[in-house]
Amino acid sequence: MKKRAIVLLSGGLDSATVLAMANAQGFETYALSMRYGQRHSSELEAAKKVAAALGAVRHEIVDLDLRRFGGSALTDDALEVPTTGVQEGIPITYVPARNTIMLSLALGWAEAVGARDLFFGANAVDYSGYPDCRPEYVAAYETLANLATKAGVEGDHIRVNAPIIAMTKAEIIQAGARLGVDYSLTVSCYQADDEGRACGVCDSCRIRRAGFEAAAVPDPTRYR
């Protein structure tokens, strides 16, 4: 039987690449997305398309309304998404504890289906400065996962994989292109419209556009 892995899938470029990488490593992949009250639903529509295109065995979308807490421009319409370029420090688009919440859901699903590997698209090179995308965070979460689960305490080690964490955006795009990822299906924009068209000026759009240019790969992003 093939090894199973849970892959966090937002619908964006990074997580699509990570799903393709997990497939290439021979895993039977289970894709997990979250409807957490983000500004638009087009990234979840993108996640559905990516999961189908890359052959995920199952794709689950979990509802968990983080708008009740707010604290981020992605979950609070009163806060504006920055459009002036990537700045120093942790930006207002950081969603409090989002990766920890999503990895915890993935961990629960992993135990339920007998998966021992979690994959997610954390990146500490071309990114917006999020604290839960750093190597030390990934290592700490893996320690937690093995202390907090039946599998872990019985010696069936759970691994938290962040295969693109040290890659530039250009390197990620080149790797995905080699694996056949169709980036036209992905949505990275923080404020995409209902058709998935990108704003072109938020941090995520700027980093994505620069990545395609540096990778010398045609950019299929639809801008409005």
Swiss-Prot record:
Function: Catalyzes the ATP-dependent conversion of 7-carboxy-7-deazaguanine (CDG) to 7-cyano-7-deazaguanine (preQ(0)).
Coiled-coil features, chain-numbered ranges: none
Protein name: 7-cyano-7-deazaguanine synthase
Pfam families tied to this protein: QueC
Gene: queC
Cofactors, names only: Zn(2+)
InterPro entries attached to this UniProt entry: QueC (IPR018317), Rossmann-like_a/b/a_fold (IPR014729)
Keywords: ATP-binding, Ligase, Metal-binding, Nucleotide-binding, Queuosine biosynthesis, Zinc
Reaction catalyzed: 7-carboxy-7-deazaguanine + NH4(+) + ATP = 7-cyano-7-deazaguanine + ADP + phosphate + H2O + H(+)
Pathway assigned to this chain's UniProt record: Purine metabolism; 7-cyano-7-deazaguanine biosynthesis
Enzyme class: ligase
Top-level lineage group: Bacteria
UniProt keyword Nucleotide-binding present: yes
HAMAP family: QueC (MF_01633)
Enzyme Commission number(s): 6.3.4.20
Residues reported in the UniProt entry to bind Zn(2+): 189, 199, 202, 205
Family the entry assigns: Belongs to the QueC family.
Entry's cofactor comment: Binds 1 zinc ion per subunit.
A single GO molecular function term of this UniProt record: ligase activity, forming carbon-nitrogen bonds
UniProt key word Oxidoreductase: no
Binding annotation for ATP: 9-19
Originating species: Ralstonia nicotianae (strain ATCC BAA-1114 / GMI1000) (Ralstonia solanacearum)
GO biological process: queuosine biosynthetic process
